[in-house]
Amino acid sequence: MSVQHVYEITVIGGGPVGMFAAFYAGLRQADVLLLESLDELGGQTGNLYPAKILYDIGGFPHVSGKDLVTQLKTQLVHFHPEVKTATEVQTIDQDPDGFFTLHTSQGDFRSKTVIVATGGGAFTPRKLAVDYDPALEGKKLFYFVQDLETFRDQEVAVAGGGDSAIDWALALEPVAKHVSLIHRRAKFRGLEASVAALEKSSVTIQTPYLIESVTPQDDQLAIQLKEVRGEAQPTLTVDKLLINYGFVTDKHHLQAWQLDTDRNGILVDTQMQTSRPGIFAIGDAVSYAGKLPLIASGFGEAPTAINEALSRLYPDRRQALHSTQLYH
């Protein structure tokens, strides 16, 4: 009977932080496996926000989600890690030898250590809370933007008040014929620089309004608005409506993996160690004092977790070197 291969490090989650962690593990010459539940690598950045422009990634004045994921994939393949997509991790058992068996939708895998980089978990968009024809989705009503060209020379309304809604309104401004931004509050809760850019833009700000109804009108959409604590009920006629009310995440897998959590995510210490020795967590999946839900933060956490995992396996091995001494 053949002996099952045991990886040194298995990274669960193929978003930007997970991909970088797998690359860094290769930089440390670790035998690494990367598991992703979706059909493609990229996480939310690649699958939900490919056209969104990111401004807080070191070395990039600005970069789209799609281009960032492309660069990370190029970086990842340098050390030829084992990558398996469409693979959902169901449970993680610890074996008598102290290593782990990951039971997945594509079979079992063994690993000496595990790095969890699952982001916010499985995600679905918060839907518009009014009745509308589902056939409008993907044609006139959108929850995701795969390609900005879909909105070229169109009258577009964006609904939402957070960073994502503001970012999309600004990204669509030079592409669309005109953009309106609908929010139920008088003030937006986005980054100060983004709000300042919005106020200087040509985007029409519709606040404080709720969407009362969305109905087809010829080849357009009629959006009935209702003023919050007021009587005004204007109608906005657009070609396309983009809803940005955030996402509902499903983190049931964390319970199945027996990891301690709080309301924000997986509890970790300063070495990114979870409540189960040998299992580490990084990125938006984790919770600790001062944690920021940024890709940039996750990029910093990845080397910490990888180096700690390798120190656990090989206490006498030299500590991490600078990349100029490792990369070839």
Curated annotation (Swiss-Prot):
- Domain of life of the source: Bacteria
| EC number(s) reported in the record | 1.18.1.2
Alphabetical list of InterPro entries matching this protein: FAD/NAD-bd_sf, FAD/NAD-binding_dom, Fd--NADP_Rdtase_type_2, Ferredoxin-NADP_redctase_2
What does the record note about the cofactor?
Answer: Binds 1 FAD per subunit.
The entry's keywords: FAD, Flavoprotein, NADP, Oxidoreductase
Annotated FAD binding lies at: E36, Q44, Y49, V89, F123, D284, T324
Q: Which Gene3D superfamilies match?
A: FAD/NAD(P)-binding domain
Tell me what this protein is called. Ferredoxin--NADP reductase
Q: Which Pfam families does its entry note? A: Pyr_redox_2
Q: Which organism is it from?
A: Lacticaseibacillus paracasei (strain ATCC 334 / BCRC 17002 / CCUG 31169 / CIP 107868 / KCTC 3260 / NRRL B-441) (Lactobacillus paracasei)
Main EC class the enzyme belongs to: oxidoreductase
Record's subunit section? Homodimer.
* Reactions mediated catalytically: 2 reduced [2Fe-2S]-[ferredoxin] + NADP(+) + H(+) = 2 oxidized [2Fe-2S]-[ferredoxin] + NADPH
A Gene Ontology molecular-function term?
Answer: NADP binding
Q: Which family does it belong to?
A: Belongs to the ferredoxin--NADP reductase type 2 family.
